[in-house]
Every structure is written in structure tokens, then in C-alpha cells.
């Protein structure tokens, strides 16, 4: 069943390091092969909820590995029994 999870990571690093840390998280998400859309404020992923939550956890670890003393994240989950896709939400705008 497909679920959407949006993730915004806010690493506690010097301002000059924010983009490199966020880029490392996005590169990791891309490496997983899951369907995703990168936006200016968050990345939305599509897949199995358990798999997506593992990705969210790993994203926190990546931030710390890249020097963040703390990571605040905003996670949004859209879950319904029949599944939900990114395309059904925004496909008409593409």
C-alpha cells in the first residue's frame, strides 16, 4: 500500500553548512530508488510506510554525521487504506 511521507530536516549547523547537509539527505533519498519529489521546503516520498519511516530515521543520522548537533524535522504522513500517490495529488499541475 502506497503512503506519502514528507520530510523537512532542519539541522543545527552553521548557516553555510545547511545546504550541504540537506543535500546529503536528498542524495540519500535519491539513492533508495523510491518515488520522491524534492520541493523548496521538503521532500515528499511515496512507498511503504515502514520503509519510508526507516528513511526518515536515517536522514536524522546523516545530519548528525555531517556535523549537526541537533536535528529538528517536520514529518507529514498521508495514509489511507487504499493507498495514495503523489501523482493523484499534483499530477494535474505537472
Which residue ranges define each predicted feature?
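Charge-rich, low-complexity N-terminal segments
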Residues: 1-94
